[in-house]
Structure formats: structure tokens, C-alpha cells
Amino acid sequence: MAKADTLPVFLKSITIQGFKSFADKVKLELGQGLSVVVGPNGSGKSNVADAIRWVLGEQSAKNLRGSKMEDVIFSGSSVRRPVGMAEVSLFFDNSTGIFPLEYQEVIITRRVYRDGEGQYFINRSSCRLKDIHELFMDTGAGKEGFSIIGQGRVEEILNLRSEERRTLIEEASGITKYRMRKREALKRLDETEHNLERIRDILAEIEGQLGPLEEQATIAREAVELTTEQKALEIEIVAFDLKEVRHKLTTSVQETEELQSAIAAAVADLSQKESEILGNKVKLNLLDEQIQKQQETTYQLDQAVNQIVQELRLRQEREGYLGEQINRVTTELSSHEEKVRQSTEQLRALEDRKALLHKTLEQANQALAADEQRLAEAKARNGLEEIEILRGSLSHLQSKLAESTAELNRFTHQLATLNSTHEQLVKEKKDKEAALFSHEQQEAQVQEQLKAQEELQTDIRLQTERAHQETAQLREQSKAGQRELQELNRDLEKKSARYHALKNLEDSLEGYQRGVRELMLAKKKNQPSCGDLCGTLADLLQVEERYEVAVEVALGAGIQNIVTETERGAKEAVHYLKSHNLGRATFLPLDVIQGGKATVAKEAAQDPGFIGVAVDLITFAEKYRKAFESQLGRTLIVTDMEAATRVARASGYRARIVTLEGDQVHPGGSLTGGSLQRKGSNLLGRSREIQELRQECDERRTQQKEMELKAGALGTQIQKGEENLKHLMGEEQELKSALAVLRTQELNLRAQAQRIHEEVTAIAARMAGIEQERDELQSHKALGAEEQSKLTDSIQEAQEALARQEEKNRQASREMEQLQERLTQTKVQAAKWEQELKQAVERLAQDQALLGENKHLLERKRKDLQDLEESKARLAFEQGDWESRRREAGEQQQQAQEVLIALRKEREVLSKELMDQESLAQKKRQEQQTLEQKLHNLELKTARWDAEWETGSRRLLEEFDLTWDEAQTYQSERNRAELGARVQEIKLRMELLGPVNQAAIEEYPKLQERYDFLSVQKQDLEEANESLQQLIAELDKTMSERFEEGFIAVNEAFKVVFKELFNGGYAELRLVDPTNLLDTGVEIIAQPPGKKPQLLSLLSGGERALTAIGLLFALLKVKPSPFCVLDEIEASLDDANVSRFAQYIHRLSDSTQFLVISHRKGTMEAADVLYGITMEESGVSKLLSVQLEGQDKDTRTA
């Protein structure tokens, strides 16, 4: 598929960087032949066609498959950041001179940044998009030609209406430039006709103005001479009046200075007094703080003294208690010592008794042994052994019974003693526990009272601190309120003075001409001749402050024009002025005055500096509309002079234009401007300022009353706060005393409860010991009772046996009975002594145990006595230290009281001095207020004189453009009456002249000159109109001829291409209206092989697509493009049609350079160079190229 070296190479290369998926810079080198770009779906191959379309000037983001132009910039990927710019360049071969540039190579570049800024370049030089369009015009290339054809273009051809399809023929016929020239010519023709109509209207208007204006100019020249003389006379009059006012002001200045000096001295003196008062108040506050601190110190010392006294009282009570305890323990010790002595003596007596009983028992036992020996001998003799045995056993049993009875009696006695002691201890313990419970309850109550009092003290302390803070805050608020009230009073005085000055000016109608002033004053007095007057324009309108200057300048002297209900009322007012020689005035009768507003040109109304028609920017009663429209209806208001010149130009210099700063552009183009010397309030602003001042003064007075009420309320609050603070401090002091008493009670109760608790513990211990001893005795008693019962039974049995035996042996010998009796008595006596001995031993053991216990108790009491004596001695030793502390605290307390009394005396002296100073300061204030009132009255007069001076000076400046110094040069030897008489003569002459148009002097020659100029322009425009109509007719003829030629050529080519693409068949283009070649539509008739002729819309999808492609190829044949980009236009074709499509474009590549974007195999097979677009990296396209020559392939990465 190699091509000859003579094949055209128009588009040499393409560079793309940052455009859509081409993040990195890539370059496509386009050689001869057919180049095909291939790649998988989504790889970005169609972005190449978008890049070419974009650089050729595509402005629709939708056509580039985006929502906004910034979407063409690479937006980043998962691994790459977005770039800030997209740039595409096309390199063209211009060796054939297809472009009208003196370069062999032409580079077209387009660049866009992320902020939306775009740039175009031709050979690296910045240019306009229009320059690029003109460069490609009628070259066959370009965005609107056939150099870029996508699948969408095929669909577009298929869906175009017949009227729209003719544009394809027009492009191929090369009449686009004629169509553009015709549009420009029609636009110019429309503008020319519009200008011509406007000039005709202006000329007609001027023709009606020239005659009257010439007459007005003659009158105006005479009026100018009279006005000049009148001006000089009025200047002299104003200067005369100002001289008198100046003299008054000079005198006023001297008096003001004297009053100000006196006020300054009074202020200084008052300031010094107030400074002294403030210093004394500061000292008083410091004294209050010192007194408060001293009170706190005194209170703390009182507390300390109370605590020491309380401690001393507690110690005295403790010492008394210890004395009582010592006495009690001493008594108990003596009792225990007596018990020990008695126990010792009893023990000694018992031991002696024990020894005696032991000796007697031994003697009895010896006697008993002898008697038993003799009895045994007797029994042996008498056989009474058994009786003796029984009697011995009985005796032994009886002895045991006696012992058991004695022991039981002892146990019973001891138990009775223990029970009595236990009952006494139980009662004593109950009494002690009841006393302990009572003390504990009392202590708990005291603790609760302490807690409540402490909480109350904390609450009172917090309330006291809060009261201190609130009182201090209220004092600060009071001081701040006084300062604000003083500032408010000063501001109110200033505003009130300004208000009264302006009100006086308004009431006296200062600023108005004499005639206007006299008429309005007469109307106020209900003068019959003035009953028809409505008021001046200044009185009848309201305007926002920002428009005041503009409206005042727009009205000029007309601001003093008087509106009347009827023309008759105006004439009556004129007669009144003449009859009383009161000057002149201008009237606007509502029944004859003509209103109307200027029509604002559309271009002028759309100007950003245009604000509106002057009459629309003011507010007035509807009945006065015609009056205001007559003065302001033809005046436009704009922001500044630049806007004024633009609006004047847009409105053809027919309207009067005023800026917000007062500069003017007059009809015809003349300008008036400069600085405005506006001193004080003007007529428009004065009423507004009076209203504002009245409102501000009312607001200040309301604020004054509110602040005075607030100050009174604060004073009441401060007084209540101080009373509350005093009350709280008293309560706090009472609470501190009550707390000291409660704490003393708590300590006493705690000490007594501790003592009782110790006694209860000791009683409980004794009771436990008694209970244990009683349990043991009861156990022994139970055993003894059981043994006694057994012994009684045994004795009874022994007695019965003995009785039986005795009954048997009653007849024994009398010797044996006597012996037995004596033996029995001896045994009984021996048993008795033995029992006594045993009891003595037991009693001795008990007494020894009791003696040990008494000795132990004696030692413990001695130890308690020693501890008590040591405690008492320690208390006695510490008593002196506490007495010393009490004396020292009492001295400190006395000193603190003395300091507090001294501080209070000093405060009383300082308070009296402060009251005297405040009384003197009040007198100084009254003196100052008297001086300030005098100064205020003088300032009011001065303000009135200043207003008169300002009015006169402003009149000099605004009416005569003179300063006071310059006006003094006009003074002559004539007095004021002579000057006034001459002014009246001039005014009479001016009345005879009637209305004077001063501007006519300058306007007439200018209007004549403008009339001549516009007449010449009218002639030129008529000639231009005729020339443009002739040009349009020639362009229509040329376009019709060229369209017809192009249609025939495209139709013939279409027939041929259709047959080649379909391998037969027939197709043609038909005109919908052959008689109207400029607007006729174009229909496509096709007859594929084997089918009948039918419209394009009736064919199958593949046939319609191939037919549309055939039409595109026919257009290319008629008007070949140096290069052509085809973006997947064969996508809907089958393989056979794709092959025919590829073969056909291969043949066309002899005259046209093709770059085809495709994924069809047949197209790729026909390619000379293949470019592969891949996306190895997500979201980033990469370019590969393959040069095909036979079977050799050279692959490289671009």
C-alpha cells in the first residue's frame, strides 16, 4: 500500500499535552497516505479528534463530550495529580500558500487553564479566535467545514431538515463568506436606516427651533446686559448686608471668647473641685475598706478572746471536775484502805481462830479416839459392834449434812449479796446510760445547730460578699451612667442648637429669593391673593440624601419655582408682587403646565452608570406630577462624568444629564462641572436635616429620661444594697457569737459524755464479773442441794437401821449407852469444830481473795488519783499560759477597737468635708450652667448670623461665583436704598422683556451649525443606504449562482460516489423550491441496488449511514479539504461496506490527507500508518505508531 512521494502533506503533526486523557505530551507525526488511529474502547482515541476540533475553535463543551470547557484538562487519576493546563498545537505545511501567511509552516495553538482563561496562538504569537476562523475560511478546513467528520456528523446529516441540509451545499459551494458579508451588510443597512430616521427626526425638531431661537437670542443679549448690571448691584447689596452681619459676628466672637474663658475658668475650678471630691471619695472608699478590714480584724480578735475565755471556762470546769474526781477517788481510796485494814484484821482473827480450832479439833480427835477405843472394848464385850458401825455411819452422814447445810447457807447469802449488788449496778448503769444518751442527744442537737449555723454563716458570708460586689458594681454603673448622661446632654444641646438654627432659617424662608419668600410668608398669613399657592418645588418634593446634589443642580434656580393650582392664582400672585414691589417669582400652574418624560434610549438605560430619570428619583404628591415632570422629566441622573458622556452619546446628546456630584452634560454636548462649594444645609437637605435633628433630639430626650430613671433606680438599689450589707454584717456578727457559745456547749457535752461513757464501761465490767461469780455460786448451790438431798435420804435409812438395831440391843448395858452418848457428843463436838475449822479456812480464803481485790482496786484508785492530780497540775500549769493569751488578745482587741474608733471618726470628718465640697461644687455647676446658657443664647444668635453670613456668602458663590473679599470690590458710594431702586428698575425692564432664554445666545449658532452638519450627514447616510442595498442585491445574485453551481456539482459527485459505495443503484439531491435558491431546502433520494427510489428516512440503518457517508465524500470531491479527520463514521457499517469505505478513502487520499479513527479491521488493513492508543496506566493515554510497508513493520513509541 505504499504511496508516491507526491502525495499531499498538509497537516504535518499534532502535539497534545494535558488534554483529556493525554496527561503527558505526545506528538503524532502525520506522513503521506492514510493514517489510522486504533485502540480499545475507552483508551482515548477519539480524544485525538476532539483535540483537533478544539484547537480549530470549538466553543461548545458539549460537542467535546464535556459539561464545561475546563473538563478538557486532564483531571488526574489514582496515581497522578491533575494538571493545570491543556494545550494542543497543529503544524501545517504552507509551502503551497494555502494560508495567506509568509511562512512555510503554520502552527495553530490553543491553550486553556483551569481558571477558565483561554489563549490562541498563530506561530507562537497571541491572536483572536476570529483570526483563526478567517485563516481557515474557504480553505475547506476548519471547524465548520469537512475537515473533521465524526459519527455524530453522520447522524446529523441523517437527522437534518431539508432547510438545514442546504448549509452542506453552501459550505461546498464556498458561499459562506458571501453569507457572512450579507449579514454584515444587512446589519450595517439596519444601522444606517436607524441613524437616518433619527437624523430626520432631529432635523425636523431643529427646523422648528431655529426661528424662535433667533428671536430669543436677540432678547437674551439685552437681558444679559441688564442681568450683568443687576448682578453687580445685587452683589453690592449682598456685600453691604454681609458687612453688617460681619460686624455682629466680630462682636459675637469677642463676647463668645469672654464667655468661653469664664466657662473655662469655671470648668477648671469645677474640675479641681470635682477632682478634690473624687480624691476625697477615693479616700472615703479607702477608709471604708480600712474600716471594714479593721472590723474584720476586731471581729477576729473578739473571736479569739471569746475562744480563749471559753477555753479558760472549759479548763476551769475541767479543773473543778478533776477536783471532784480527786475528792471522789480520795474518798473511795480511803474506803478501800479501810476495807483492806478490816480485811487484814479479819484475816488475822480468822487465822487465830483457825489455829485454835485446829488445836481443839486435835484434842477432840484424841478424846474421840480414846472413847472409840473404850467403846470398841465395850462392844467387844457387849456385841454392840454393828450398832456402833451404824451409829458411826449415821454420825458421819449427819456431819456431812451439817456441812452441806452450812455451805448452802453460805452460797445463798453470797448470791443474795451479789444479786443486790448486781441490781444496784444495773440501776446505776441504766441511769448512766440514760445520762449518756441525753448528753449524746444534746451533743447531736448542738452539732446540728452548729452545722446549721455554720451553713447559715457561710450563706451570710457569701451574701455579704455578693452584696459588696453588687454594691460596687452598682456604684460603677452609676458613675458610668452619669458620664453617659453628661455626654448625652452635651450632644442634645449641640443638636438642639443646630435644630433651632435651621428651624429659624426655615421659618424665615432664608435661602429663597425675596419674591418667593414674601409670597410664602403672605400665604402663611392667609393673604387672599396667595390662597392658590401650593408651595415651592423644594417644599413639595422629597429626595434621598445621595440624590440631593444631583436633583438640586438639575432644578437650578427652578427649585424656588412656586406651584399654583391654577393659572389665575399665578397671575394674582404676580399682581401681588407688583403692587407691593416685592420682587419676582416663577410659577407653575397645574392647570396649564405641560409634563412629560424623556424616552431613554435602550443603550443608555443599559449603561451601568445610568440611575434613572430625575423625576423618578423623587417623591411627591401625584397632583404635582406635571409640575415636576416639566422641570425634571427630561433630565437623566447618572453616577459620574464618565457615565454621563456614555449616556449622552447613547441618547444622541438630546437629553440633559446630571451626575451625583452635580456635573452636567447639556443637550448638544456642552459640559458644566467642577467643585461645588456647598456650605451648611441646602434647600433640599435643610428640611431633611431638620427632620433628622428633630427625631434625634426626641430620641436623645427619651434616652435622657430613661437614663435619669435608670440613675434613680440605681441610687435606690445602691441604698438598699448598703442597708442590706449592713444588715448582713450584723447577722454575721451575731452568728459568730452564737457559734462560739455552741462550740463551748459541744466541748462540755463531749467531755461529760466521755466521763459517763467511762463510768458505764467500768460498771459493765463489774456487772460482768458479778454475773460470772453468781453463775459459779448458783452452780455450786445446785450441787450442794443435790448432795444434801442424798445425805438426808441416807441419814433416814441409817436412822431406821439403827433404830432396828437398837431395838434389838436395847437391853445392852448402861455403860455402853453412856459411853456411846459421850462418844456421840464428842464426835458431834469434833464435827462441829471441824466444820468451824473448815468454814474458817474457806472464810480465810475468801477474805484473802477479797483482800487481794481490794488491794488491786486500791492500787488502781491510787493510779487514777495520780492521773487526776497530774491532769489538774497540768491544767493549773497551762492556766497561766491561757491567762497570758487572754490578756494579750484583750490588749490587741482594745487596740483594734481604738483604731476602728479613730477610723470612724476620720470617716465622719472626711464625709462632712466631702458634703461641703459637693455643696460648693453644686454652686459652681450652677454658675457654669448660667454661663453656658448665656453662651448658648449667644451661639444661637451667632448661628443665626452665621446662617445669614452663610446664606449671603453662598448666594455670592452660587449666584455670582464670588468670594466675600472679591465682592467688596463692587462697593460704591451709593447707599443701599439707591442700589435697591436701580435693581427694581432693571427688574421692571426684565418683566417687559418677558421670558428670557439665556442659552439662546450660544444655542442659536450652535443649533444652526448642528443643523448644517446633520443635513450633510443625512445626505451621506442616504447614499450609504443605497450603496448597501445594491451590495446586498449583488451578494444575493452571487450566492444564488454559486449555490446552483455547487448543487449541480455535489449532486453529480453524489451520484457517482453512491454507485461506487453501493456497487450500483442510483441517488440524487433535489431542491425543495428551485425558484428560491437562497432559502430552498435539499432532499436526498436514494435507490440502492434492487430497490425503488425513496427518501433517506425510509432506508435501513446501514443504507442510511452509507448514503450519508457518500454525501460527505461527494462534498469532499467538490471542495477537497487539505486534510480530513474521520472519527468512527463507519462504525455502523457491515464488513463488506467497511471494505468499500476503506478502498474509497484510500483513493481520495491522493488529494486529501486522511486521519481515520477506527476499530474496524477493513479500515486498518487499508492504512499506511497505524497509531495505537493504549491506556497502560489507568486514566492516561499512550501513543504507539506503526509504519506499514509491505510486510515490514517498524514499531516505535512516540
Curated annotation (Swiss-Prot):
GO terms for biological process: chromosome condensation; chromosome segregation; DNA replication; sister chromatid cohesion. Required for chromosome condensation and partitioning. This is Chromosome partition protein Smc. The keyword DNA-binding applies. It comes from Desulfitobacterium hafniense (strain Y51). Belongs to the SMC family. SUPFAM superfamilies: P-loop containing nucleoside triphosphate hydrolases, Smc hinge domain. Residues 785-818 are annotated as: Disordered. One of its GO terms (molecular function) is ATP binding. InterPro entries: P-loop_NTPase, RecF/RecN/SMC_N, SMC, SMC_hinge, SMC_hinge_sf, SMC_prok. Residues 175-211, 322-524, 687-1042 form a coiled coil. Contains large globular domains required for ATP hydrolysis at each terminus and a third globular domain forming a flexible SMC hinge near the middle of the molecule. These domains are separated by coiled-coil structures. Residues 803-818 have a biased composition (Basic and acidic residues). It comes from the Bacteria.
